Amino acid sequence: MNGQGASADPQLQQFIEIESQKQRFQQLVHHMTEVCWDKCMDKPGPKLDSRAEMCFVNCVERFIDTSQFILNRLEQTQRSKGSFSETMTD
């Protein structure tokens, strides 16, 4: 090796970050599927009835809404911490 290691390769770092994001997304989808399945499926049959279908739609939409709310809240918190620390250093 050249002594710099893998941390010096920006392309490798970007690839690892993208793969990590893919993995987190897959975990989120798996979790959402599991939660909504347990909530909406009473008895699996040959096809989805309209009640179960509507339950899945609502479950996924609430999951997305909640995730978006949490992300927005975290972003606001980070911004307020950043502006607070900037005023402290001025």
Curated annotation (Swiss-Prot):
Compartment(s) where it occurs, according to its Swiss-Prot or TrEMBL record: Mitochondrion inner membrane
Motif (Twin CX3C motif): 36-59
Gene Ontology biological process terms, A to Z: protein transport
A GO CC annotation given for this chain: mitochondrial inner membrane
Pfam families documented for this protein: zf-Tim10_DDP (PF02953)
Keyword Membrane: yes
InterPro entries (alphabetical): Tim10-like, Tim10-like_dom_sf
Assembly and binders: Heterohexamer; composed of 3 copies of TIMM8A and 3 copies of TIMM13, named soluble 70 kDa complex. Associates with the TIM22 complex, whose core is composed of TIMM22.
Domain notes: The twin CX3C motif contains 4 conserved Cys residues that form 2 disulfide bonds in the mitochondrial intermembrane space. However, during the transit of TIMM8A from cytoplasm into mitochondrion, the Cys residues probably coordinate zinc, thereby preventing folding and allowing its transfer across mitochondrial outer membrane.
Entry's family note: Belongs to the small Tim family.
Role: Mitochondrial intermembrane chaperone that participates in the import and insertion of some multi-pass transmembrane proteins into the mitochondrial inner membrane. Also required for the transfer of beta-barrel precursors from the TOM complex to the sorting and assembly machinery (SAM complex) of the outer membrane. Acts as a chaperone-like protein that protects the hydrophobic precursors from aggregation and guide them through the mitochondrial intermembrane space.
Name of the protein this chain belongs to: Mitochondrial import inner membrane translocase subunit Tim8 A
Organism placement in taxonomy: Eukaryota, Metazoa, Chordata, Craniata, Vertebrata
Gene: timm8a
